Amino acid sequence: MKRKLFIDTGHSAKYQGANGEVEWVRKIAEKLYPLLDTTYWDVVKVPDVYPGENSASTSLIKRIRWINDNGDANDMLVSIHANSAANVNARGVETCYYSGSDKSKEEALR
């Protein structure tokens, strides 16, 4: 059985994150989908609009709830962001994982 790979574009249209972030990450996601190996993964796009969304944290909670309702512990989430920083020289990648699971850490380190 294939694992699900949830792709989330980070913010909703209502709560867009950094200036221009929502448009940028959607373009990245659209370029990413055809590159993913569907031999091992069922690729699932996470919806970005939920009824009753009234804050960025509500949006995140509803996204996580949707993913949990549509997946299981063997699945993976990639949430794409284009964060900003006060320091114009800041560069890099950030990976977050569930610290209560050695398996999550192993996956994040791959």
Go through each PLM region and give its residues.
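Active-site-proximal helix/loop segments of hydrolytic enzymes
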Residues: 2-5, 13-15, 23-110
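Extracytoplasmic/periplasm-facing segments of secreted or lipoprotein envelope proteins
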Residues: 18
